[in-house]
Amino acid sequence: MEPVGCCGECRGSSVDPRSTFVLSNLAEVVERVLTFLPAKALLRVACVCRLWRECVRRVLRTHRSVTWISAGLAEAGHLEGHCLVRVVAEELENVRILPHTVLYMADSETFISLEECRGHKRARKRTSMETALALEKLFPKQCQVLGIVTPGIVVTPMGSGSNRPQEIEIGESGFALLFPQIEGIKIQPFHFIKDPKNLTLERHQLTEVGLLDNPELRVVLVFGYNCCKVGASNYLQQVVSTFSDMNIILAGGQVDNLSSLTSEKNPLDIDASGVVGLSFSGHRIQSATVLLNEDVSDEKTAEAAMQRLKAANIPEHNTIGFMFACVGRGFQYYRAKGNVEADAFRKFFPSVPLFGFFGNGEIGCDRIVTGNFILRKCNEVKDDDLFHSYTTIMALIHLGSSK
C-alpha cells in the first residue's frame, strides 16, 4: 500500500473521481464522516492531508465528556497480567476522546503482587512497577497519568453511567477515568514526597500545582500513600492543612501505594510515603461532598445521607461520583449485605457513574460548592475535622456542559 501524500493525490484507477473530489475539498462532508471514528483512528487519518487534519481537530474538540474504562470480577482471573491493563488496551481502540489526564485505581493485592513472591520483597516491587509501566504506555505520551492502588475498588461497569456500581472489596479490579482537555477547566496533578530531612512545604510548591493563589480552584482530590510508615499520617495532615480552609471541595483518603505519576521526572520509589492528587480549577465546576459516619449503618440511614447530597442540586449531566470508604465498612459493616452505599447512591443519582475505593482512612466533610461559589455545610463540622476512620465520603464533581 502506497502512503497517502495528499487528499488530491489518488493513484488508484478504481476510485470514483467524484468521491475523491468530495473527500478532498468539502470539509463539511469529511467532518461528518470523521465523527463516527474513535480518537485513535482520527489521529491516524489526520496525517492524510491538511483538510483532514483540520477536520480531525474540530471533531476532537466536540468530544469533551469524561470517559471511563473499568474492569471488575468478570474480567479478572486471566494469567497474562492484571485485568485493568488488558481491558484498557482493548477499549482504548474505541474511545472517542483524546485523554489529557488519566486517574486510575486498582486493587493492591493483584496489581502489586501478580506472582507469588516467596518472601522475596524486591521481586514483588519489581512486578508492581512493570504492571504500572505497561498501563502507562497505553496512553498518549503527553497524557498525565496518576495511578494508585488500594485494598478495594468501587467501579461502574462500562457502557452507561446508569449501570449498577459495584463495591469490590476483595478481588482483581480497577478503573481508569479519562479526562479530555476541557475548555475553561484545568486539571493538575500534584505530589509531595515526605522527606524526613525537610518537612517544610514552600508556598511556591503549592502555587505551581494550583493549590494556592488560585481563585479558580474548586475541587481537590487528595490521597496519602504508605501512611502506615512513621510520620506519614502527620505529613498528610500537614499538607492538607495548607489549603483546607479555602472555599473548596476536598475529598480523598489513605491508599496503599502510588503506582503511577507520569508528570514526575524521576522514577517512583514504592517505599516512599507522601501525598498525591488532582486539583480541579474552573468557574464551571460544581461539587458537593457528604460524610457517612459511624451512625450510618443500614440502608435507611445510607439513603438519608444520599438525600443530603441530592439536596445540593448539582447538575447530573457530565458529572462523576466518587466514593472513598473505609475497609472496615462494606459487606460486614452492613450485616452481611453488600453494595449498600453504592446502591443508595444509584437510587438518588440514576445516571451518574460512581468510582472510588476502600482504603485506610477518609478525608472530607459535608460541603457544597455551587455555581455562584457559595460554600455551605449540611451539618456542623469543624473546618479542621477532615480526617476520619470507619466512614465513607461521597462526592459529586460536575465539569460543566459538555457542549
Swiss-Prot record:
Positions of post-translational N-acetylmethionine modification: 1
Chain positions with N6-acetyllysine modification: 194
Q: Which Gene3D superfamilies match?
A: 1.20.1280.50
GO annotation, biological process: cellular response to starvation; nucleocytoplasmic transport; positive regulation of proteasomal ubiquitin-dependent protein catabolic process; proteasome-mediated ubiquitin-dependent protein catabolic process; protein modification process; protein polyubiquitination; regulation of skeletal muscle fiber development; ubiquitin-dependent protein catabolic process
Q: Which domain of life is it from?
A: Eukaryota
Enumerate the Pfam families for this protein.
F-box, FIST_C
Residues bearing PTM Phosphoserine: 128
Q: What does this protein do?
A: Substrate-recognition component of the SCF (SKP1-CUL1-F-box protein)-type E3 ubiquitin ligase complex that is implicated in the control of various cellular processes such as cell cycle control, transcriptional regulation, DNA damage repair, and apoptosis. Promotes the proteasome-dependent degradation of key sarcomeric proteins, such as alpha-actinin (ACTN2) and filamin-C (FLNC), essential for maintenance of normal contractile function. Acts as a key regulator of histone methylation marks namely H3K9 and H3K36 methylation through the regulation of histone demethylase KDM4A protein levels.
* Name listed for the protein in its UniProt record: F-box only protein 22
The scientific name of the source species is: Homo sapiens (Human)
